[in-house]
Amino acid sequence: MVEQGRFVETQLEGTKVAVVFGDIVDQEVDVIVNAANERLAGGCGIDGAIHEAAGPKLPKACRAIGFCETGDAVITPGFNLRARYIIHTVGPMYAAGEVNELGKKHNEEAAKLLASCYKKSLELAIANGARTIAFPAISTGEFEYPADRATDVAMQSVKTFLQENPSAFDEIRFVMFDDDYFSLADRIFRDNFSS
């Protein structure tokens, strides 16, 4: 485990896996992942920032695709971004607060859908020749997925994927945009990736 400044990294199955503090739109990787909505229409938070930074061709490309199911992923060029591609994945909504049995079942399904977001994004990246990819904290904003649970699902999903697909990537990053998310992700990263 290497720790320097605002990132922590390790090696797993021939891949550098890291948690970094920064802005997803500034990452110099083959693919950045966008926490999109089903209509791929842009929005607020990370989705809005990516649409703004990628420029006016991105909305047109998203309209041509039209729709993305929750738990699935689609790809567009990166346009004005440093990344060659943007993978748009739609994370699940989370039933927050006091929930009944139906709410508990919804949240169990939400965890499966969130794991699918990571798996489908990684598969799509490989299919398009990508060797480096950066993920935001999918579903933790407007979709109200608790950050600790979402981060654990993200890291477990990536770990499982790499164990099943050794050396599929050179680097996988989890990009955290504020101090609280970074501290949380750092702790969960150490829990999941410590030898």
PLM segments and residue spans:
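Glycine-/small-residue-enriched capping loops at alpha/beta junctions
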Residues: 1-127
